[in-house]
Structure formats: structure tokens, C-alpha cells
């Protein structure tokens, strides 16, 4: 695995990609990071350790933010802290990438071109569903800019930065459906949104339902489906609009 030296003094990229991580292997982190390095639009990669830092990451071309303990919120807190770190440095947009996923080289440039054309403050893409070994199953049929955008497919431009705090201020039961809650706040805010159909995010499937959605049997040992319904019900019980 190559070791990259950080290059202080270089111009700050306009876009940051924020990756929270917890106990993912160094190999997965490297695949994730390598895909950010390969973007054809310059990006700052911010890796945020949620209480379990990998020492080797400090030698990569990243901003490595280490939190002293884990937050147990499926990456929401490190996602927000990484975003605010990058915004404080002066970036004009933040995107998200989970530690076990990776990007097509044109992902960021495609979204930023869509922003330039439309003036949108929130951009989104499709995603490609992949098996645990990284092989591709096909485009995700669930992505719908009106109802569901995966976190990895989201880009917030500066006009949408005021919405990012919802990663942490959502109710504790909400982190399981955090991407739907964030899309709810985006749509409620009235900011201009633009969706790009290209499936430029590679999403490693760790949930049985996605395999069945694609007509495959889930691999042995994969965790049981989380209880999303309980979170949706509590969201409604709290007086919120359906997601």
C-alpha cells in the first residue's frame, strides 16, 4: 500500500469529501481514499476517526481528524465535525463517502458541473450496488430524489451549509434513517436541488434487502435487516411529516 506525503501550502480545493470511520480495515480505508485521490476535480479528503484511529492514515494525503471516543450514531457526529473542519478552512462544498465505499473518478466533477449549470445548493447522484467483494451488481433502483438519496450520493454547497447541523440534532433513533431525515430537511428548506442520474457512487452492500432487491441471495453471515420501521414510526409519533 503506497504512503502519500501531505503537501502543505497547496491551494485549498473547493470541495471536501468527508469520511467517518470506526473499525473498518486499512484496506477498505485505502480503497475509499484512493477513489478520492483519483477524482478529476480536486478534493480535500477529511477522514474522521470516531474513537478508533488508524495510525497509518496520518501519513496519507488527508486531513485526519481524531475524535477521543466513539459516538455510536452511525457516523453522524464525525460527519458533521469533518464538515465544519473543512468549511472553516474555506471549502465551498462538502460531499460524503462512507469508509467501505468508493467513487467513480468523475463523481465530484459531475455534481459540480450540475451545480454550475443549475445554481443548485444541494446535488445528488445515483449509486451502484456492489457485493462485499466489490463486484458490481447494478444501479440502485431505490434512489429517488423526492424520497431517498443515500448519504454517499449527497453534496451540500455553501448555500446549504446551514442544514448540516441536523446530522447531530436529529433524534437518537433517527441516525438509522439519517439520510432520509437529511433529505427531509433539505426539501423543507426550499433550497434549489439538482439530481444527476449517473450512478457514480459504488456502495458496498452489507444489508440483505439490497441483495434481494437485485435478485440475489444475501451472502452468508450478513447482519439481519435493521428495524427501520421503528425509526419511521417514532419520527411520525414525534409529529413529523412522513419521510
Walk through the language-model features, giving the residues of each.
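N-proximal low-complexity "stem/linker" segments adjacent to membrane-targeting elements
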Residues: 1-34
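Short, acidic, metal-binding catalytic loop of nucleotide-sugar glycosyltransferases
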Residues: 31-43
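Glycine-rich, basic loop-to-helix element that forms the pyrophosphate-binding segment
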Residues: 69-86
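Short beta-strand-to-loop acidic/aromatic patch adjacent to the donor-nucleotide binding site
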Residues: 91-102
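Acidic donor-binding/catalytic loop of UDP-sugar-dependent glycosyltransferases
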Residues: 101-113
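Short beta-strand-to-loop element that shapes/binds the nucleotide-sugar donor at the catalytic cleft/hinge
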Residues: 123-136
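Catalytic beta-strand/loop signature of glycosyltransferases that borders the donor
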Residues: 124-126, 193-200
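Acidic donor-binding loop at a coil-to-helix junction in glycosyltransferase catalytic cores
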Residues: 173-182
Amino acid at each position: 500500500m503506497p504512503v502519500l506525503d501531505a503537501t502543505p501550502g497547496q491551494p485549498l480545493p473547493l470541495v471536501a469529501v468527508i469520511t467517518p470511520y470506526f473499525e473498518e480495515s486499512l484496506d477498505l480505508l485505502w480503497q475509499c481514499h484512493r477513489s478520492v485521490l483519483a477524482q478529476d476535480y480536486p478534493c480535500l479528503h477529511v477522514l474522521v476517526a470516531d474513537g478508533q484511529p488508524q495510525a497509518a492514515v496520518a501519513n496519507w494525503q488527508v486531513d485526519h481528524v481524531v475524535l477521543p471516543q466513539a459516538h455510536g450514531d452511525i457516523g453522524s457526529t464525525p460527519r458533521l465535525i469533518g464538515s465544519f473542519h473543512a468549511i472553516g478552512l474555506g471549502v465551498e462544498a462538502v460531499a460524503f463517502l462512507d469508509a467501505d465505499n468508493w467513487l467513480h473518478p468523475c463523481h465530484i466533477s459531475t455534481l459540480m458541473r450540475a451545480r454550475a449549470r443549475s445554481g443548485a445548493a444541494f446535488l445528488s447522484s445515483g449509486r451502484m450496488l456492489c457485493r462485499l467483494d466489490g463486484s458490481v451488481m447494478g444501479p440502485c433502483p431505490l434512489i429517488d430524489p423526492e424520497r431517498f438519496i443515500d448519504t454517499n450520493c449527497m453534496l451540500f454547497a455553501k448555500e446549504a451549509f446551514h442544514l448540516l447541523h441536523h446530522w447531530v440534532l436529529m433524534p437518537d433513533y433517527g441516525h438509522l434513517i439519517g439520510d432520509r431525515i437529511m433529505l427531509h430537511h433539505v426539501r423543507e428548506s426550499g433550497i434549489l436541488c439538482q439530481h444527476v442520474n449517473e450512478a457514480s457512487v459504488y456502495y458496498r452492500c452489507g444489508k440483505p434487502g439490497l441483495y434481494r432487491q437485485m435478485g440475489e441471495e444475501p451472502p452468508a453471515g450478513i447482519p439481519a435487516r435493521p428495524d427501520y420501521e421503528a425509526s419511521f414510526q417514532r419520527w411520525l409519533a414525534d409529529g413529523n411529516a412522513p419521510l
